[in-house]
Every structure is written in structure tokens, then in C-alpha cells.
Amino acid sequence: MAKQVFQTTFAGRELIVETGQVAKQANGSVVVRYGESTVLTAAVMSKKMATGDFFPLQVNYEEKMYAAGKFPGGFMKREGRPSTDATLTARLIDRPIRPMFAEGFRNEVQVINTVLSYDENASAPMAAMFGSSLALSISDIPFDGPIAGVQVGYVDGQIIINPSQEQAEQSLLELTVAGTKHAINMVESGAKELSEEIMLEALLKGHEAVKELIAFQEEIVAAVGKEKAEVELLHVDAELQAEIIAAYNSDLQKAVQVEEKLAREAATQAVKDQVTAVYEEKYADHEEFDRIMRDVAEILEQMEHAEVRRLITEDKVRPDGRKVDEIRPLDAVVDFLPRVHGSGLFTRGQTQALSVLTLAPMGETQIIDGLDPEYKKRFMHHYNFPQYSVGETGRYGAPGRREIGHGALGERALAQVLPSLEEFPYAIRLVAEVLESNGSSSQASICAGTLALMAGGVPIKAPVAGIAMGLISDGNNYTVLTDIQGLEDHFGDMDFKVAGTRDGITALQMDIKIQGITAEILTEALAQAKKARFEILDVIEATIPEVRPELAPTAPKIDTIKIDVDKIKIVIGKGGETIDKIIAETGVKIDIDEEGNVSIYSSDQDAINRAKEIIAGLVREAKVDEVYRAKVVRIEKFGAFVNLFDKTDALVHISEMAWTRTNRVEDLVEIGDEVDVKVIKIDEKGRIDASMKALLPRPPKPEHDEKGEKSERPHRPRHHKDHKPKKEFTETPKDSE
């Protein structure tokens, strides 16, 4: 296929798609150029159906450091495991694509996005999402797309599509919305306490922009798209299905309606084991034994799926007996752990999360060195999901994509209410340990995080709570569920997580298994989530009504001062000599950022105060009209140089030493004398003039005697040091400098 180029303008930037030139052995490949960001996307599919009971889709987002003109960090100087941002972007692309494959499709599909050049003002992740959909759509892979996604900001009351870096920094909203031309099917967002109305407006305007991108994709597919391959789908034997339903459906229905999770799981598993044993014996010698037993397992799964949905839509009863808008029993505890800087334990039904707070100096911030310019990350929220939380054995090791994603969601929800660095000069880490799980553990971790922050004395703006909403839809009718449990998440159509304060939403995340949901469903889900959020906040505020006024005794004491950026080198000194001396003298630790924020921490408050005094002295600046106790450090014919403080000297001109005339500076001061001086002038080069006489009483005007002659002039004021007399003088030398 020859190279073809397609071009349009989207959100004020040029969008160019190239096909038929590179990666031609993949089932589908495109090069997407958005602004100066360039992403190569290749999609491939296995020839045969994979084993297993799930669709093996893998989406990668690979950040090549050369794309930003940078070397990879580390000893090897080569890209290694994906960064957290790359992992989150891969999940972001996977989620709207996954529902667009047919039920029963089991061939392995890989979609690989490689960032070849990076423009921070033109979203490479959105280009990758566009490219992923387009590569699948023009390929022979049976993908029921296209889909597209956009980023949405909210600046000065205006909705902005794909905001620039500068706009994103000012935005009150960081939203990614994806979908088909008919409906939204994925949402990911952080927000600064925005109302449900603003969030809904942003979602709908984002979807309008999505439609533009889909229309562009359809134009390209019409020009270069391949015919879709005929692929075997997983279908169960209809006669076998009817036989099992007739014999065992009533038993399975009773098992599904057991309210307690572990008892329900045991009851349903007992039915499945019974059916499996019957058919293993019946078809033990059959040549298609493996296929038959696979069908049996799939039929039992479909029966459980159908019964859960029937209970909710027809009987209006949930598996655990709750109403559709009812939250499970809640419990909140603070100070669960001693010694730590803060802890909170939050329980919702059979979902339980423990959050532990750690505070540290700013030197402990995480340095993020990716495609964007390097920056320091002050707040971290980590989420751990051990297998014992669901009563199972399993893999232990580094966090997977799910744990990284849930941690990031909690981080977005809580980051919106954290105090500024000036208000609270600490690095903050929260770790959520999921101790029990029966659905919505990520939202439990947000609630537990709020408890830990408040108990630890972190002055957050407001408590944050989170709730997960679900959906059961048959295409014509739907039911929105509040606080979904694991079974409802597994067999339902939507997992819509909403976190926020009483004043507004701080985070959204939505994943669906159908091809999209309507504005009507979104509106109802947001309203229902708000009601539930307030109920949870009532419980949190009853447990700890306000942030504690003091940090835990075990938390480090930190104080901060702000210095001018051009003074940083003075505090650090040549080769770090000055700052090392301060640390050695006081025993504190000191962090200085590029904006001039100096953080000093120690367990000893007196040591912190001493270090602050030293640093304040180093960066102190003289000001006109201020008075200083200064030491004479040098004498010249035209005056004396005095040290005001640290390395700051001033000149006291001979004419500014006394109200009476003198021809020798040494008659008034000597090196080492301490004198009071007042700053009278600072020139544009920073040179300082000071005066001694400005602090002395002005002598009265000379009086005339009867002959009209002036009386003798008054004696000069005696100097501080009176160990030797001062010589009188009669001549006034010419002033020179």
C-alpha cells in the first residue's frame, strides 16, 4: 500500500495522519503528527483464539527519551520499565478500546504506541489514543470502532479542548473523555472542587470534540481500511446451555441471593462444582472433552451474570439485600497505629482500607524525569492490594497497572485539597493498604487518606470522600447503583467513581463494558453520587471534626523561610561550603529549591531557630533609614568602612562622623570600634553610605558675643571608647574619595 497523508486542524493545531509507509507488516499502523508530537501506532492480532476466559488485549505507550532530546537516566542510559505516566496513559487508551470488541472474541491483540517526537503543547497521549483507534479501524482486526479521546480544561469559566501546557497549569480541571460518536465510554479526571453541573458540561463538550475526531477517522478508514477478518468467537453449545439452565438455574439463583460475600461465593462455587463434576463424568471419554468443559464453565458464568442483573432490574433487589441507592455500613477510625505521623482506617461493608501518612522534608520529593521537563513531585499516594484482602493466594511483587492506576486516582482526589508549600513545607506520602475488598477499594483508600491527613495535622482545605456508582442496562431500561460491591462491578455495565468535598468534585473515573452511556445516565449517576458522598463525609466528620492543630510528636519539625533567588548561591557558598558549615554547626538538615524556599528540619526546635538566624543574616539586605550597630573594619583618609552585618559593609564619610569638622578620621574612630550608624543612601550598584552624626543631637547655632565675635564652638561628643583622648584640629582637609 502506497503512502497516503490525511490532514485536518483540531483544537488549533495541525493533525496529520500518514499510512502505508512504516510498520507495514502489522495488521494496521499509522503515524500521527499532532503539533510537533509524533506517535507511531501498530496493531497486531494473533492467528488463533487464545486459551483462557478473557480477552487478551495489551496496550503499550512507550516513551522514547530521544523524542524530547533527552538521555535516559540511570547507569544503563537506556529506556527500561515504563514510567508511571506511561503506565497510566496505556490504561487510559486500553479502557475505551476494550468494550469495542465482540463478546466471545479471544484472539490476542496488541496495540503498541511509540512516542517518536514530543511537543509538550500538543498532547502525545491523545495522539496515541487517536492512533490506537485508527490503526485498529483500518486493519483487518474485528474492531467495532472508531473511538477517540480529548483532554478538557476549565480556565476563567471557559471549557478548553486539548489545553496547552500554560493553559493546563491555570486550569481548574484536568479531564480526559473518550467515546464513540454515539456516547461516552471512558472518563478520567481531577478537578478543584467543581460542581456536578460544570463537570457534566465539560463531559458533553468533550464528547462533541470526540465526534470531530471520529469523523476524521471514518474518512481515513473509507480510503485505506482493510476488510475485516473472519475470526472464530467463543460460542457455547446451545443444547448444552439449555440443559444446564433447566437443571441447575434455580440452585444458582438461590446461591446468588445469599447476602454475605464469603457465604455467597461458597454457595455459588458449590453449585458450579456440582455441575462440573456431573459433566466431567458424563463426557470423560468424549473427544471434545476440553471444549465441553470450557462451555460448562462459560455457561455457569453466564447464568450467574444473568441472575444478578435480573435481581436488580426486575426484582429491584441487590445481592446483599440493599436498595439501589443504599450505602453499606460505614466505620471510620483514626490513630489506628502508634509512632506513625498519621493513620486512618475506613470500612464500607466488606471493603476496608488502612491509610498511613508520612511527612518528610522537601529533599524527599520524587524527581520525575520523563518527556516533560524534570520536576519534583511533593505528594505521593500509593495503593497496595494484597491477595489476602479477597481471601486468596496470588502474586506478590512490584505493583501492577491496576495498583498504579488506583493510587493515581486517589492522588488526584486528595491533591486538590492539600495546603500550598508555603503553608505546609513538607513532602507528603500516603500509603493505602487494602485489608478487605468487596468492591470500591480505591474509594475506600481516599476516605482513609482523608482520615490520616486530618489526624496527622495536615491542614487540608476540606475532607474528601469517594463512592463508586454502577449501572445495569438492557438497552432500553437502566438502573444506577450506589456503592457497588464486587459482584455488581463484575457483572454490571459501569464502574463510575466520584470523589469530592461538600463543595465539589475532585476526581472522576468511569469505565464501562457497553459501548457508551447517555447524558441522562451521567446526570443521574452524578446526583446519586453527591448524596452518597455527603453521607460518607458525615461519618468522617463525626470521627474527626477538624484537622488537628499540631503534628504528631514523631513527625519532623520543619520551618521554612523565603529568600531571593539571587541569594541562593550566598547560602550554599562555594562548593557548598557555607551550607555545610551551617549544618555542622546546628545539626539541622536544609533543603533549598530553585524558587528560594529554604526548608530547615530537625527534631530540635532550637537548632532550627539558630539555623534560621544564620541564613537570615546571610541574605539580609541593608535598607535606607535603618540603624545598625556596626564595627569599624577599615579606615581611609576620606572616611571609615563599617561592617553592618555579615558581609555587608558601608562607608561613613568623614563629613558624616560628627557635626563638628575634623581632618583626621583616626581622631574619631579606630579599627575595631563599635558605632551606631544610620543608612542614608544605597546607590544603583548596591554601595551603601551611612552616617554617625545622623544619630547625634544637632548642636545649637553659634551665639555672638558683645563684640560680634563667635563664641568658641562646642566640644565634640565623646566617642564610645574613651581609653585615649582625641586631638583637637583647626584645619579642614579637602574631602576626597
From Swiss-Prot:
Record flagged with keyword Repeat: no
Domain S1 motif: 625-693
One Pfam family here: RNase_PH
Catalytic activity: RNA(n+1) + phosphate = RNA(n) + a ribonucleoside 5'-diphosphate
GO CC terms of this entry: cytosol
Main location: cytoplasm
HAMAP family, per database record: PNPase
Name used for this protein in its record: Polyribonucleotide nucleotidyltransferase
Species for this entry: Streptococcus pneumoniae (strain Taiwan19F-14)
